[in-house]
Each structure stands twice: as structure tokens, then as C-alpha cells.
């Protein structure tokens, strides 16, 4: 499992960097895990150069038995009885007159639980689009009502692969609503806006990265299988969001080092965190091409593992993600024992998230990053 989670994290950070290049100061929110899952389904049907480019970009070339590992990971993440709701759903929507190889359909069904729904793109592409959106809306509890905008599919569309992920978790330690106050949030050195700032003082895993002058806070969700981890610089030092330096150093190795339990200490922390809600949409063709996935989106695509016809390529990889963080906990969706100590001399730390920060929601047992974002403006 470790190999796969390392590959998924490397890809998550590469994609974050690619999105950052085209949007250096705005909000970013994605579910890298959802995107990796959807691309892994496509990978099942790729051959030749197309397969090599995708494997390399997703860092799957370092992982043995990639698909069976995904299968166990999906089962682990979707496990019932967990104290949070986390739903991962995959589906293929195929043109009903087009012949897909039975082996491909059997593999996606077995490994990713993805059924093929036959739709009529050829004669009724608008109805097909609505059916796909309706399915995603249902899987994400209404949070993503329109994954595919009008015109994204047409009569030439053969296949749409959809991955939807939905998460709702309550904080292990909730914020009291009455402690929430209006407070300024600094967007950069010059500008600020008023936000609803939540507050609580409890013991949390806390760390400090000296060379980056950055605080690390882990806020566990009930059950502790999932946590939100926040990287907050002490101040805004650059001319943008203040996150440049951290973003330049974001690698799998660094991230593991900064956030591993041995490097975090359970301390009393005064946590000030804004309530926020992000809804972001991405066309991932350009960022993926930047990461080396080039043949998939055009006539050079080799998808002969999906169909014998040579005319199949992936026209678009669309991703939408939603997150809401409040006093109770977090709701997010995307498509693609403390020991009591005398409290006399407990050192206290302040964690005042009143300027931009990077955050991610991690599945702790597998170390997979399910959601990753930058909050520049709540």
C-alpha cells in the first residue's frame, strides 16, 4: 500500500504545482485521489506510448500490481461503519452503439467497481449529459449538481469516465459556534477581507518548520482515520500569498517529514480558523499534458485495451471539487488518547490562520491525500 500512496502523493503535488503555475495566487481545491482513480481506470485500457506516458506522470511506474492495490485501497477507504461518510464511486458512460472490449469492462468492474451505463451520445447527447450529471449529483449528496457543462459531450462522444468522491466528517474536537467572530483575513501584504473566524483551545498535534517559518497543525476528524493538516506560514513574506517558499519545497519526502507523528507534539493550541467553502472546476487536459500525458487527448492515443477501433481518444478530463469547513467539521465532495497532565506549565501555541494557507485531508491508515487545497481567499 505504501508504494501506491507514495505514487499518489507525488502525483498530487505535481498536479498542485501545475495548477499553481496557471493560478499562482487564487484558491485551489482538488481531490487528487479521485483524479488518480479515474486516470487509473483509463490506464487499464491504454497500450504502448500512451500507457508509458500515463504511468510515468502518475508515478505508477514505481508500483507493482497497481490495479489490485487500488482495489484494496478503495475497499479500505470505503469501509463501512467508519465514523465519517466517505463515498467513492466510479462509472463508465459509453455510447450504446460502440463496441468496448469485454475484458476492459470486466477489469474496470472488478477493480474499480465501475459499471458501464449505455447512453445515446450519438442521437441524444444532451440527455446523456443530464444523466451523467444526475448520477454525480446523487453520489455527492447534491454538492456537485453539474459536473459536465453544456456542450462538453456531443454526438461524437464515445466514452465518459466519471469518478466521484464525497466526504463528510465531524471534528474530533468541535469549535463552539458562539466563539466564532468576524475577523480580518489578510489576502496579501496590502488587502484583507472580513471572515467568520472560528476559535477553540485544545490539545492538537502541532509542529514548526524552522527553515520555512511555518506552523503545522493536525485537526483529526472523529475516529481519527482522517485528519485535516494545515501548513501556515508565520507571515506573508512574498508579494503574493506568502506561500511561495512552502510551495517550492513541497515534495513527498518533505511533506512526510513535516507531518509525521514523531515530528508533531501534542500541545495546547489556540486555533483560529476561518469558516470557508470552496467550489472549484478544472479542465485537466493542459495540466496533465504539462506532466507528460500527451498522446491521450488526440489521434495518437492508443486505447486498444478498451476497443479494437483505433479512433478512440479521451477528449476531456473534467474535475469539480467542493469543500465546506465549519464548526461541526467538514463536508467535501469531488468528482474525478491524550494523557491528562497538570495544566500548570503546559506550553501554549497560537495558530492564527488569518492569511493564506495550504491544507489537505489525509486518510491516515494509508497516508493518501484525498483532498488538497490552498485557501487564498475564504
UniProtKB/Swiss-Prot annotation:
Keyword field contains DNA-binding: no
SUPFAM superfamilies the record matches: Serpins (SSF56574)
Site (Reactive bond): 343-344
Modified residues (N6-acetyllysine): 137
Modified residues (Phosphoserine): 299
Modified residue annotations for N-acetylmethionine: 1
Pfam families given in the database record: Serpin (PF00079)
Gene3D superfamilies named in the record: Alpha-1-antitrypsin, domain 1, Antithrombin, subunit I, domain 2
Localisation: Secreted; Cytoplasm; Cytolytic granule; Early endosome
Annotated keywords: Acetylation, Cytoplasm, Disulfide bond, Endosome, Lysosome, Phosphoprotein, Protease inhibitor, Secreted, Serine protease inhibitor
Domain of life: Eukaryota
CDD domains, alphabetized: serpinB1_LEI
UniProt xrefs under InterPro entries: Serpin_CS, Serpin_dom, Serpin_fam, Serpin_sf, Serpin_sf_1, Serpin_sf_2
Region (CARD-binding motif (CBM)): 350-378
UniProt main location, coarse: secreted
Subunit structure: Monomer. Interacts (via C-terminus) with CASP1; CASP4 (via CARD domain) and CASP5; these interactions regulate the activity of inflammatory caspases. Interacts with PRTN3. Interacts with GZMH.
Similarity remark: Belongs to the serpin family. Ov-serpin subfamily.
Protein's job: Neutrophil serine protease inhibitor that plays an essential role in the regulation of the innate immune response, inflammation and cellular homeostasis. Acts primarily to protect the cell from proteases released in the cytoplasm during stress or infection. These proteases are important in killing microbes but when released from granules, these potent enzymes also destroy host proteins and contribute to mortality. Regulates the activity of the neutrophil proteases elastase, cathepsin G, proteinase-3, chymase, chymotrypsin, and kallikrein-3. May be cleaved leading to a loss of its anti-protease activity and to the appearance of an endonuclease activity. However no catalytic site was identified.
Name of the protein in its database record: Leukocyte elastase inhibitor
Organism: Sus scrofa
Gene (UniProt): SERPINB1
Amino acid at each position: 500500500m505504501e508504494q501506491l500512496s507514495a505514487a499518489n502523493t507525488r502525483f498530487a503535488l505535481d498536479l498542485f504545482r501545475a495548477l499553481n503555475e496557471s493560478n499562482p495566487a487564487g484558491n485551489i481545491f482538488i481531490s487528487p485521489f479521485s483524479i488518480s482513480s479515474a486516470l487509473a481506470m483509463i490506464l487499464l485500457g491504454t497500450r504502448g506510448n500512451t500507457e508509458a506516458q500515463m504511468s510515468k506522470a502518475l508515478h505508477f511506474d514505481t508500483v507493482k500490481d497497481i490495479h489490485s492495490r487500488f482495489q484494496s485501497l478503495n475497499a479500505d477507504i470505503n469501509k463501512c461503519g467508519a465514523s465519517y461518510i466517505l463515498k467513492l464511486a466510479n462509472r463508465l458512460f459509453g455510447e450504446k452503439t460502440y463496441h468496448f472490449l469485454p475484458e476492459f469492462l470486466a477489469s474496470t468492474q472488478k477493480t474499480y467497481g465501475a459499471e458501464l451505463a449505455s447512453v445515446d451520445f450519438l442521437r441524444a447527447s444532451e440527455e446523456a449529459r443530464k444523466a451523467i450529471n444526475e448520477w454525480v449529483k446523487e453520489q455527492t449528496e447534491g454538492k456537485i449538481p453539474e459536473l459536465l457543462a453544456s456542450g462538453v459531450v456531443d454526438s461524437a462522444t464515445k466514452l465518459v469516465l466519471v469518478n466521484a468522491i464525497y466526504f463528510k466528517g465531524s471534528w474530533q474536537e468541535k469549535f463552539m459556534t458562539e466563539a466564532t467572530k468576524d475577523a480580518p483575513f489578510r489576502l496579501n501584504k496590502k488587502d484583507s477581507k472580513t471572515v467568520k473566524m472560528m476559535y477553540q483551545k485544545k490539545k492538537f498535534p502541532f509542529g514548526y518548520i524552522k527553515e520555512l517559518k511555518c506552523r503545522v497543525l493536525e485537526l483529526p476528524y472523529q475516529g481519527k482515520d482522517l485528519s485535516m493538516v494545515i501548513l501556515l506560514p508565520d507571515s506573508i513574506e512574498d508579494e503574493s500569498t506568502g506561500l511561495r517558499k512552502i510551495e517550492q519545497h513541497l515534495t513527498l519526502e518533505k511533506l512526510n517529514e513535516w507531518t509525521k507523528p514523531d515530528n508533531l507534539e501534542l500541545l495546547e493550541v489556540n486555533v483560529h480558523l476561518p469558516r470557508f467553502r470552496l467550489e472549484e472546476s478544472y479542465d485537466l487536459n493542459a495540466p496533465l499534458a504539462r506532466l507528460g500525458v500527451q498522446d491521450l487527448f488526440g489521434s495518437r492515443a492508443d486505447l486498444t485495451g478498451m476497443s479494437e477501433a483505433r479512433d478512440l481518444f479521451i477528449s476531456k478530463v473534467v474535475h469539480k471539487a467542493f469543500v465546506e469547513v465549519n464548526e461541526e467539521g467538514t463536508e467535501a465532495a469531488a468528482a474525478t488518547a491524550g494523557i491528562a497532565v497538570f495544566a500548570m506549565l503546559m506550553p501554549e501555541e497560537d495558530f492564527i490562520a488569518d492569511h493564506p494557507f495550504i491544507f489537505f485531508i489525509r486518510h491516515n491508515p494509508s497516508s493518501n491525500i484525498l483532498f488538497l487545497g490552498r485557501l487564498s481567499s475564504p
